[in-house]
């Protein structure tokens, strides 16, 4: 990316499940961080969802073809497919997904009038939204639905960059302190089912 994210990340790793179209994103400070992220993703898929990862397709970049990753794939019986250099069509699923996420994320940043350093938050939110949109390739089911077996709720979804107020716990404020702090909505936490908020007052 042209600028570092708020958390100091420089790269976006996007993993796309060929079967469902479900995406998983990671913001990375260095390219070699992708190794642990890929391992973490594969182990989560195989243990939490009881799915067998059969193959991994990538463009042959050094960080994706490292020996530790090759050994990891071999141990799990995962086939490694390397696409043809400079032939983007051979990795069309990933190329289209990246283009889609960047387009959505860029639009959200523009609409919210936020600096480009919020790109990681915008990208993760775009992925979260895309996973919950019906896909014509999957009989109008959402990728989330295909993976989890039930329809996702969208009642909790908010406009990226909108103004928010976060309640400050009584234990962390005095009688005369404001009850809430102002912030900007910057996404969702999938594990804890919470919102991500940028604290304006901390600047």
For the regions a protein language model found, what residue spans apply to each?
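Anionic group-binding determinants
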Residues: 1-203
């Amino acid at each position: 990316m042209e600028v570092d994210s708020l958390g100091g990340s420089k790269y976006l790793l996007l993993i796309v499940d060929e079967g469902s179209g479900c995406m998983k994103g990671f913001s990375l400070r260095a390219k070699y961080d992708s190794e642990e992220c890929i391992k973490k993703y594969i182990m989560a898929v195989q243990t939490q969802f009881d799915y067998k990862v059969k193959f991994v397709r990538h463009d042959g970049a050094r960080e994706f073809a490292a020996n530790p990753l090759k050994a990891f794939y071999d141990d799990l019986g995962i086939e490694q497919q390397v696409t043809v250099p400079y032939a983007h069509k051979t990795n069309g699923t990933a190329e289209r997904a990246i283009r889609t996420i960047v387009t959505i994320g860029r639009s959200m940043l523009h609409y919210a009038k936020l600096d480009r350093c919020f790109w990681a938050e915008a990208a993760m939110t775009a992925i979260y939204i895309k996973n919950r949109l019906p896909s014509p390739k999957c009989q109008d089911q959402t990728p989330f639905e295909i993976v989890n077996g039930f329809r996702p709720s969208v009642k909790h979804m908010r406009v990226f960059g909108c103004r928010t107020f976060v309640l400050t716990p009584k234990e962390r404020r005095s009688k005369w302190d404001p009850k809430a702090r102002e912030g900007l909505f910057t996404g969702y936490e999938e594990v804890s089912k919470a919102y991500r908020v940028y604290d304006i007052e901390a600047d």
